[in-house]
A protein has these predicted regions:
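Conserved C-terminal region and hinge/linker of Rieske [2Fe-2S] proteins, especially
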Residues: 1-181
């Protein structure tokens, strides 16, 4: 481990923090890209005859590639997460890359942090492809400053437009939970 220089002024401390934050953000983007590369290497299409013995796993929404089951545990181990957390990370990376391409471009360019892209991906997983495209178009340009409430409104609008049956089912389920005694 390299020795850390002594930071003896406020300016030096802030400069070091900014540099470390920039380095950490760039590393997170590289890991997100690596997750997509890993999924592509282990997509059901790319593993050929081994797919007969290996189960297919949908880790992202409709239209995203299916991956071989074994690859999730290996990836999770490599990033130091549980299998479930690794699957979520892998799925959210694939969701952004394949179903939210405008957002992906902003993430790769460093304009949107990975944590925010993952939050958006998690919200779009259950949308049909057209709904994800709607969210991508409306959210990508402002994703870095988007609040969770704003994201929920855009996702709900996409659900109503592109999956009205599911939107109505969710509305009724929410209404069932309300009661006055």
């Amino acid at each position: 481990m390299a020795a850390t220089p002594t930071l003896d002024t406020a300016t030096a401390v802030l400069a070091a923090v900014r540099e470390d934050k920039s380095t950490a953000d760039a590393a997170e983007v590289r890991m997100f890209q690596a997750a997509v590369d890993w999924a592509a290497m282990h997509s059901v299409d790319s593993i050929g005859p081994a797919a007969v013995w290996e189960g297919e796993l949908p880790i992202a929404g409709e239209g995203a590639p299916l991956v071989a089951e074994f690859c999730v545990a290996e990836f999770a181990l490599a990033i130091g997460k549980s299998t479930d957390a690794g699957r979520a990370y892998l799925g959210e990376a694939v969701e952004v890359r394949y179903r939210l391409p405008k957002l992906w471009a902003h993430v790769v360019a460093g304009r949107v942090p990975v944590w925010k892209a993952r939050q958006i991906a998690k919200a779009t997983l259950s949308l049909p492809m057209e709904g994800a495209g709607f969210v991508d178009t409306h959210v990508a340009p402002v994703a870095a400053r988007l609040s969770y409430a704003q994201l929920e409104r855009v996702v709900e609008e996409a659900r109503v437009r592109f999956d009205p049956i599911e939107a109505e089912a969710r509305r009724l389920a929410a209404a069932d939970g309300r009661c006055f005694d």
